[in-house]
Amino acid sequence: MPPKKDPKGGKAPPSKKKEGSGGGKAKKKKWSKGKVRDKLNNMVLFDQATYDKLYKEVITYKLITPSVVSERLKVRASLAKAGLKELQAKGLVKCVVHHHGQVVYTRATKEADVIVE
């Protein structure tokens, strides 16, 4: 038997999709260019000028961490840690927090820790 035809005749007009509806090919998102950081060229050993700066300037900072010293004196973090241990041994800085990941020092005050109540 042949297929039945619409009594009205002709084909139904194809339904148009609304714009912005899901599906279809959307414009592909491009990868953003990552931020490029300059290579740090930090010193591995103290020279005399930097060593003097460690003793004069670093002990005046309120917050002293290896990362702060490394950034300001342009030395490696391991060298900054060693310098801060030396300053602590001489009593020029005082350890506030000793965490396994970060050590925080502050300048040593003249008065021995006097707690005012």
Curated annotation (Swiss-Prot):
Coiled-coil intervals, chain numbering: none
Region described as Disordered: 1-34
Record-level Gene Ontology MF annotations: structural constituent of ribosome
Pfam families: Ribosomal_S25 (PF03297)
Lineage of the species this protein comes from: Eukaryota, Metazoa, Ecdysozoa, Nematoda, Chromadorea
Compositional bias ranges of the Basic residues kind: 25-34
UniProt cross-references to InterPro entries, sorted A to Z: Ribosomal_eS25
Name of the protein in its database record: Small ribosomal subunit protein eS25
Keywords of the record: Ribonucleoprotein, Ribosomal protein
Entry's family note: Belongs to the eukaryotic ribosomal protein eS25 family.
A cellular component term, taken from the record's GO annotations: cytosolic small ribosomal subunit
Chain's gene name: rps-25
Provenance organism: Caenorhabditis elegans
